[in-house]
UniProtKB/Swiss-Prot annotation:
It comes from Human immunodeficiency virus type 1 group M subtype B (isolate JH32). This is Protein Vpu. Pfam families: Vpu. The chain crosses the membrane at residues 7-27. It is a single-pass type I membrane protein. It is found in: Host membrane. Phosphorylated by host CK2. This phosphorylation is necessary for interaction with human BTRC and degradation of CD4. One of its GO terms (cellular component) is membrane. Ion channel activity is inhibited by hexamethylene amiloride in vitro.
Length: 80
């Protein structure tokens, strides 16, 4: 009887550990996807700036909304 209880407790512990690990994996995956989206927007802004001579305001607004910062160009740091 005690071995049955121990087996059930072990299964519960393993299930909790699996949920925690997969939650961490999911959070990190979302971070990676978000960073890829930011990188694509930065590349698009750079590409348009090279083509037209000025930067695209729409892409900068989208990037600043995505990054949730007041700084429009995170790669242009002059306030050190």
């Amino acid at each position: 009887m005690q071995s049955l209880i121990a087996a059930i407790v072990a299964l519960v512990v393993v299930a909790i550990i699996a949920i925690v690990v997969w939650s961490i994996v999911f959070i990190e995956y979302r971070k990676i996807l978000r960073q890829r989206k930011i990188d694509r927007l930065i590349d698009r802004i750079r590409e348009r700036a090279e083509d037209s001579g000025n930067e695209s305001e729409g892409d900068q607004e989208e990037l600043s909304a995505l990054v949730e910062m007041g700084h429009d160009a995170p790669w242009d740091i002059d306030d050190l």
